[in-house]
Amino acid sequence: MEVLMAERPTQVFHNKVIDGTAMKRLISRFIDHYGIGYTSHILDQVKTLGFRQATAASISLGIDDLLTIPSKRWLVQDAEQQSFILEKHHHYGNVHAVEKLRQSIEIWYATSEYLRQEMTPNFRMTDPFNPVHIMSFSGARGNASQVHQLVGMRGLMSDPQGQMIDLPIQSNLREGLSLTEYIISCYGARKGVVDTAIRTSDAGYLTRRLVEVVQHIVVRRTDCGTVRGISVSPRNGMMADRIFIQTLIGRVLADDIYIGSRCIATRNQDIGVGLVNRFITFRAQPISIRTPFTCRSTSWICQLCYGRSPAHDDLVELGEAVGIIAGQSIGEPGTQLTLRTFHTGGVFTGGTAEHVRAPSNGKIKFNEDLVHPTRTRHGHPAFLCSRDLYVTIESEDIIHNVCIPPKSFLLVQNDQYVESEQVIAEIRARTSTLNLKEKVRKHIYSDSEGEMHWNTDVYHAPEFTYGNIHLLPKTSHLWILLGEPWRSSLGPCSIHKDQDQMNAYSLSVKRRYISNPSVTNNQVRHKFFSSYFSGKNQKGDRIPDYSELNRMTCTGRCNLRYPGILDGNSDLLAKRRRNRVIIPLDSIQEGENQLIPSSGISIEIPRNGILRRNSILAYFDDPRYIRKSSGLTKYETRELNSIVNEEDLIEYRGVKVFWPKYQKEVNPFFFIPVEIHILAESSSIMVRHNSIIGVDTQITLNRRSRVGGLVRVKKKAEKIKLIIFSGDIHFPEKTNKAFRLIPPGGGKKNSKEYKKLKNWLYIQRMKLSRYEKKYFVLVQPVVPYKKTDGINLGRLFPADLLQESDNLQLRVVNYILYYDPILEIWDTSIQLVRTCLVLNWDQDKKIEKACASFVEIRTNGLIRDFLRIDLAKSPISYTGKRNDLPGSGLIYENGSDRANVNPFSSIYSSSKARIQESLNPNQGTIHTLLNRNKESQSLIILSSSNCSRIGPFNDVKSPNVIKESIKKDPLIPIRNSLGPLGTGFPISNFDLFSHLITHNKILVTNYLQLDNLKHIFQILKYYLLDENGKIYNPYSCSNIILNPFNLNWYFLHYNYCEETSTIVSLGQFLCENVCIAKKGPHLKSGQVLILQVDSVVIRSAKPYLATPGATVHGHYGEILYEGDTLVTFIYEKSRSGDITQGLPKVEQVLEVRSIDSISMNLEKRIEGWNKCITRILGIPWAFFIGAELTIVQSRISLVNKVQKVYRSQGVQIHNRHIEIIVRQITSKVLVSEDEMSNVFSPGELIGLLRAERMGRALEEAICYQAVLLGITRASMNTQSFISEASFQETARVLAKAALLGRIDWLKGLKENVVLGGMIPVGSGFKTPSSEPNNIPNNIAFELKKENLLEGEMKDILFYHRKFFDSCLSKNFHDTQEQSFF
């Protein structure tokens, strides 16, 4: 301190805050001026002063010191709003999943960064001496990021693999985390724990490998005599001065440096601070320096090529173990910096664009000449400013000036009004984040079930020519058409046909697969035949056992056009039989005076197509006999003879026959309305037994009475029956009968209440309780019914020319469904009388079965359907051409083995109510899709819940626009007859005339011509897209008549907007919220199937946006299930920028693993490089120079990659250390197989300098390949087998060395340590006795020639600097090959 006191009058007092960086510079100046000893004495005094001040200040930290930033609330709301809009765009198909992920991450990262930037001004304004604020900028272990997590928001987290979790933690640690945020926080914080434990060991292992590969590198000579060097230049300001200084200080010049004609530095002069400053000042020529790359030695290094020692400002001493120092210098920062993640808690620290926000409300103004319009990387319109742009925001009382840096995006227009804190500009990230990105694959999974379609061309990837992998050539949408898929390898392919109607929610198809998909159709056929034909066809046969086959339940209505016994009527080989009846199915037109509505008649046929005697063929429920309320039935007990005697009854599974108890034919019969409730035993009843209640009285907690009257409660079998009798209660003196019906005009004439009755009455005698003797009489109104003969089902089935035999008879029977004399019915909808059509044939025939099937005939586009019934002598007489399953192998658990077909509700109706009926949400249509596997078949069930209807459009004024747009091309094929439901079967999947229908001569016109079809179709203006992709226009093509079974194809859709005159074609896909009418946008996305003039219906579809190069999985029209892989994107993804991700990159570079994907246009770059080399150097030099430049370029590129990782973390490592490592992994070449076989064995690894010397000695061309060895392989390919054996694979290395007879000259450190010898470094280093001046003259002459050759090489390599600066930068990924940057 005496020196300081003496010099105080001449020194200036600086009142300035010193941070860590300034302290480093101060210590460096102390060492330069006063030396190390005196500097340590000064720093001890500074340390003591710091502890004394900290004790006096006594800074503490409490929870009240954590001040939350006020602007956080609306910043988070703004980010949530942006995320919501982004989610909407993704749902509409405007943004694909990768864009959504990337933009979401950028939104939240920008919000978190803005909060972090606002934190410091907030502390300075509100509490500048806040302990948290003081600690965060003290330079100790901790930074602003941790304080930001305490008082701002924790933000985005990184998982242990370094990938971002796109769900941000919006809370900070002061507010506390929710459960979800806590789980994500633990997941991210686990990253710090993992890094501390595992990555530390990785860094230690990296240090061991680095030391292993360079442990023998020792400074052994002063000068190796090389004239080569590497050129370094500031590149006209492209290289930062700081990096330029770090690169040059401590190096040795390889050539003289001239400014004009004056030499300012000579060869072999070391570069200090003063010389570097002169280089920067004068902007001298590119400077050639000596590096370890240019040293001529193989196993050591010279003083001048290494340069100054890092410890002191002088050339490195001889005997210095610079290799071990280099390995430690690279490995040690990795070990230390691994711990950084633990302190940041796994928070993502990436580089994205920063936002500039408006300071206040006002009008923004800027010079429009300095900007030009463009789009941001997300496609949003913006202005790009090429230089600094000053923006003024004029509010009412103040004008704010904001400076926008160059290459930024301005997101507002000139003279636009902006609100406070609105984002007005986006600043590009200052540091390039390319080194923090990697190419990854992102799989997109389907979130719905249906069929996949696309509206663009795709092509197969060449490596998957026969697979289902497709590449998209351009941006397009993938669509999932919604539906309920079902797949099975069992026999339903012969049961369910295309266009079948079924209950959409009854089959076990809904997300339930057959449990044994390995069962093939052949196994099912074998099982069915063996069980079906095993017994004799007599009464008492056992029912075939199908329990081993998997089951599928089916309830409700199913519309089966082709029963399985005939397999679509396509392959019968039976002989001609006359026991056949064919019934034409008439289409009943609306508007006729008819008693039978067409929707009430159903044909009932078993699923296997087999009918027994007295089977019900069709039935009709008369609406006049339907009651909507519960009640009692009453009729006389007089019974008629049954149609079928009980002893003649043959019971067969699933076929309904007439039981005698059904055959009560009474006329009239009566219905007594009574309200009946069946309640559970645990129900709380709120009315009493024998009480009288009014209408709408609370009975239980959730039930009310519909009528008023007497309440009777009965308990039966764990259930309570509550009956409410409406009517009058009388207490007569005596009663004769317990039950009595009084007709109109009846009653006792001597009664006081005598009155001529107009209606039927029902009198019932009742007791108040079981033990009471007194009776009372309940008088109830009665509804009488008479059965009429007006229902004539025979009119629907006329006997005509098609009937070949009188053996088969059809009888019409009316019967009452409820047979007890008094039966209580509590259903809400009761059918009292049913009319049925019974099939019968002669008793003397021994035939017990008849087979029924539907036949469809087309002539000139006209379609007609028939029901055909054949008597079958035995099942063997029916054989199939393809050995198909003659019956179904499915058992229905509810015992109902029949299809209810309603062919009379036809599409010929012009009623809109019928259209609504066909869109019943409980109905669905089966669509068959062909699988690549021929043994199985895929079905998709399309219900009306997958469709939506729009309209009617009342404001459509010109329907001719629609007509004209369709008439231009009435039959439009869509993707080569692939319809909207994929590669389905055609509407009729069998040959219509492959078998003989009848032997009688008939006139086809009698059955196939409908006179009033033209009139009907002129009323219906709609356009239909069918399975084959053809467009049917019944309005203009009246000869096309749709099959009446295709009820479900009433999916109508037309997209029409009068304002924009939008005309949408059939089959087109529409995204959500497309304008189709004046009422507003449409709500769902889907595909156009059918269109009408005034209303439209679409089939719902889910769009997915895909970019060019994306991989599509699956075929067009293929069924996809929820969770299936839909498309794969390849994109660049940001990785977190901490050292845990950088350290593996260092390891990848030094182990020479590929870390960057190969450029797409690599071939063009190589072609350009070859042309450039040939043009400048000429043909003879091309290969020789090319091999040399390849090694030089690869070395410089590796150094730059390693430095880039460390510099991104603020770690400074001298290039010398990395160069020593890289020299070792690039100093080997691989001997080619065609040359040098007489000197080296093919494929042998030899040193690069050794190969060159051998070539010069042999005076012949040397063929070798430059190879990059990783540090592990380089450690295993040294001159010392003892060093290799001590590293790894000891037994193999020693055995191989013994077989080859290798000699270890013990030149390295490790082998001497193993054998206990003196290590050749430091005090154990021996100065070389032979210097170059002792070499004889003739050898000196050879050396001189060699030097001349090297001088020529140097001229070619390093004096054509324009060539290197231009060509190398254009033809290689790394453009800084000459700068170590």
Curated annotation (Swiss-Prot):
- Give the keywords, sorted: Chloroplast, DNA-directed RNA polymerase, Metal-binding, Nucleotidyltransferase, Plastid, Transcription, Transferase, Zinc
Q: Which EC class, in a word?
A: transferase
- Official protein name in the record: DNA-directed RNA polymerase subunit beta''
Q: Where in the cell is it found?
A: Plastid, Chloroplast
The record's section on Gene3D superfamilies has: 1.10.132.30, 1.10.150.390, 1.10.1790.20, RNA polymerase Rpb1, domain 3
Paste the cofactor note.
Binds 1 Zn(2+) ion per subunit.
An annotated GO cellular component of this protein is:
chloroplast
Query: Which cofactors are named for this entry?
Result: Zn(2+)
Catalysed reactions listed for this entry = RNA(n) + a ribonucleoside 5'-triphosphate = RNA(n+1) + diphosphate
Q: How does it assemble?
A: In plastids the minimal PEP RNA polymerase catalytic core is composed of four subunits: alpha, beta, beta', and beta''. When a (nuclear-encoded) sigma factor is associated with the core the holoenzyme is formed, which can initiate transcription.
Supply the NCBIfam families for this chain: rpoC2_cyan
